Regions:
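C-terminal binding/interaction regions
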Residues: 121, 125-126, 139-169, 174-176, ...
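Glycine- and Gly-Pro-enriched alpha-helical subdomains that act as flexible
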Residues: 76-116, 246-348
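Flexible, glycine/charged-enriched surface loops at secondary-structure junctions
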Residues: 61-69, 168-171, 234-241, 271-282, ...
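Gly-rich Lys/Arg/Thr-decorated short loops/hinges at beta-loop-alpha junctions or inter-strand turns
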Residues: 27-39, 113-119, 193-212, 290-311, ...
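Conserved helix-loop functional segments at active or binding sites
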Residues: 57, 231, 268-272, 357, ...
Length: 396
């Protein structure tokens, strides 16, 4: 490990014209991070430090290795290290890698939930990065990774990525920041207590619906949803299933637009597992990013763009049949037992109606709307179980 320092000079800030730029410790102490490879930038460090908080909290809450895929200071995906089914391994493009370590499974899930958004991500890992995880990272387009450590083999693999320029950051897992945090906006200093809220079973005890039966797996998914939201730009909602986020709606001014955006991402995750998409025959040599783009267009309303004569031949060996609206709805109707978390209350029941279309069965939200009764009534209509946490999770 390289020698620690209390300041790192950066090439520039958010944009190339914002100079000078650095990260440093105001009290003169050593930074909790060490750059092992590459030259991370301003936004890289923002993603890294937010992502590290997310995965370390997921590990604490679930006892499982965790990973997140960050883009522009919000997670595109987050997951814990549960084994992959054959179908998930295929849609995440890791079915050729054999059995993966739990940490590698966590990153495959985090990256795979929304591969379009995760392109060029910054990765955070809760555990020491092993060779399996490094091999998975090496094949993806990514800006960098932060972890509490790296095996010798993993570090060698990562240092060879991007012609030797891949950003690798090591963080001291014992580091704890001060209880008060500050930032400046337009020369004015803002100060607040850190959000040290623990997402635990006690927070998930106030069920307000008729259905109060929630399996252990769904309680874990609720924790994943809320911890993910804690580090997502508000307004935000998060759909979770099977130990991973499957749709995150971030930074929307309207709650229903969050729910729709994240719901569409969850729908796309499920549609990728349909026979129509699994049966696509890509031309030899087509890269993962091009396959992802082709699938995204094929599943969407603009499918004719990828099925046009002279276009489909560049992506597919055989021209795919149109994936009709009726076929998609029939497949989506099979998606069940999804968990939905929200960083603030649902003001109208339209959010519940939209969530139902994406298979939501369990909901965790603060409550506190003047229309809570209408929201609860809508949940009862669909036999959903909803918990009021009483805690808002805004993040800016």
């Amino acid at each position: 490990m390289e020698e620690k320092m209390n300041e790192i000079q950066l090439k520039y800030g958010c944009n190339p014209n914002q100079k000078p730029s650095r990260i440093f410790m105001e009290d003169g102490s050593d930074l909790p991070v060490t750059v092992l490879n590459g030259k991370p930038g301003y936004i890289n460090f923002l993603d890294a430090l937010n992502g590290w908080q997310l995965v370390s909290e997921l590990k604490k809450a679930t006892g499982l290795p965790a990973a997140t895929s960050f883009k522009h200071v919000s997670p595109a995906g987050a997951a814990v290290g549960l084994p992959l089914t054959d179908t998930l391994a295929k849609i995440y493009w890791v079915d050729d890698l054999g059995e993966l370590s739990p940490l590698a499974c966590a990153y495959a899930r985090a990256r795979g939930a929304d591969r379009m958004s995760s392109f060029g991500d910054f990765i955070a890992l809760s555990d020491v990065c092993d060779a399996d995880t490094a091999k998975l990272i090496k094949r993806e387009v990514s800006d960098g990774v932060i972890a509490p450590g790296y095996t010798v083999e993993a570090l060698e693999i990562l240092r060879a990525k991007k012609k030797g320029g891949y950003n690798v950051i090591q963080i001291d897992p014992s580091y704890r920041p001060a209880e008060i945090e500050r930032k400046q906006v337009f020369g004015v200093t803002f100060e607040q207590g850190r959000n040290e809220l623990n997402i635990d079973e006690e927070l998930l005890s106030n069920f307000v619906t008729k259905n109060k039966e929630v399996p252990e797996e769904a309680l874990i998914d609720m924790k994943i949803a809320l911890i993910t939201l804690k580090y997502t730009q508000s307004n935000s909602v998060c759909y979770v299933k099977g130990g991973q986020a499957i749709g995150i709606g971030a930074g929307q001014q309207s709650r229903i637009h969050c729910t729709r955006l994240a719901g569409q991402k969850a729908d796309n995750w499920w549609l990728r597992q349909s026979p129509q998409v699994l049966g696509l025959q890509f031309v030899d040599g087509l890269g993962r990013a091009d396959r992802d783009n082709a699938i995204d267009v094929y599943m969407g309303d603009e499918y004719e763009d990828v099925l046009a004569e002279g276009v489909w031949q560049t992506r597919f060996k055989v021209k795919p049949a149109v994936f009709t609206r009726e076929e998609k709805r029939a497949w989506l109707n099979q998606l069940t037992d999804v968990t939905l978390g929200s960083d603030a209350f649902f003001p109208f029941s339209d959010n519940i109606e939209r969530a139902h279309k994406s298979g939501v069965k369990y909901i965790a939200q603060p409550g506190g709307s003047v229309r809570d009764d209408a929201v609860i009534e809508c949940c009862d209509k669909y036999d959903m179980a909803m918990v009021f946490t009483g805690i808002r999770l805004f993040h800016h």
